[in-house]
């Protein structure tokens, strides 16, 4: 068994990536990226350059370089999430971005008053949606998702109707790791005339994502987990091109 494992390690085309991270203990097998990604060595160099040159030496002149970083960094995230340039913006944190997009989605569907999510969604996502529902006088419908099996498209179909404005779900379940059918569920939501908002916090950087290919409307995600951007790193949001001139910033 050990020989087989050693051979798999030796043949792994990604094995060399370990040397790109500040992992001092060679015996450490770090599998907690869902909580906090490891520190890339390149980040140490970039942070030193940013602090010494961009801030320390260039001072206010660096604003000219920094001002469009949210969009440029967003396009890099777009490469991970299957989003064409100009649709992803790095900003704020996941909770704030979820609040902004959910409110904008409700405003974009006047006459509809239902938000759909599931009871196994990440707690802070549920708290935001509960708060918005209370503020707006909307109805929040909770799917009773099987924790181990994950989201069932048939349950989503049964929960949405002509009153549904928004469906907000996690692409990967934070407790079980269950992967949702992004394309199938998004299509069901669109058939009901509602908007689809995906939380990518536990999938970005870990599994393939194709936001444009799945016809997703909106998405949010963080960068400190599998993207390895570090504690306190800003989150990101995605707004599909067809909605950019439709949605309005609520704050």
Question: Where do the model's predicted regions map?
Answer:
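Pyridoxal 5′-phosphate
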Residues: 1-251
């Amino acid at each position: 068994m050990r020989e087989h494992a050693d051979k798999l390690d030796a043949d792994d085309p990604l094995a060399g990536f370990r040397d790109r991270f500040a992992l001092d203990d060679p015996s450490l097998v770090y599998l907690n990226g869902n909580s906090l990604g490891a520190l890339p060595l390149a980040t140490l160099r970039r942070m030193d350059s940013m602090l010494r040159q961009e801030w320390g030496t260039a001072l206010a002149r660096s604003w000219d370089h920094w001002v469009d970083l949210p969009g440029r960094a967003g396009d890099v995230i777009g490469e991970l999430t299957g989003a064409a340039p100009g649709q992803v913006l790095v900003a704020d944190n996941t909770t704030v971005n979820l609040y902004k997009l959910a409110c904008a989605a409700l405003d974009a569907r006047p006459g509809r008053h239902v938000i759909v999510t599931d009871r196994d969604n990440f707690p802070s996502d549920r708290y935001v949606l509960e708060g918005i529902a209370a503020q707006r006088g909307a109805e929040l419908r909770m799917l009773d998702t099987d924790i181990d099996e994950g989201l069932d498209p048939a349950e989503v179909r049964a929960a949405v109707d002509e009153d549904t404005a928004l469906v907000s779900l996690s692409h990967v379940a934070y407790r079980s790791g269950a992967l949702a059918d992004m394309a199938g569920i998004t299509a069901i939501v669109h058939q009901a005339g509602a908007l689809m908002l995906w939380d990518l916090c536990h999938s970005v950087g870990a599994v393939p994502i194709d936001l444009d290919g799945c016809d997703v409307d909106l998405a949010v995600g963080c960068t400190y987990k599998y993207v390895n951007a570090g504690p306190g790193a800003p989150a990101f949001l995605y707004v599909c091109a067809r909605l950019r001139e439709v949605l309005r910033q609520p704050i």
